[in-house]
Amino acid sequence: MAQIRVIHDPIGETLTIYWDDPEREEICEEVGQGIILIKDAQGEIVGFERLYFRPSNPSQDLEVILHMPMR
């Protein structure tokens, strides 16, 4: 089963989300408005990073909802 990794760095004000192995990261492409796409060597997106991320309520927990494809 695939895992999603969510990393929030409150000091660096970044939110990074990987839906594939972070070790596959080879290329980062800034696409605008503080969004960076993280790609593997083949150019497939394995995650993204949001710069200047400040949650509206930092004391709130981050809720992650996974939608699994139906078979």
Regions found by a protein language model. Name each.
Residues M1-R71:
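Small, basic N-terminal interaction modules of short regulatory proteins
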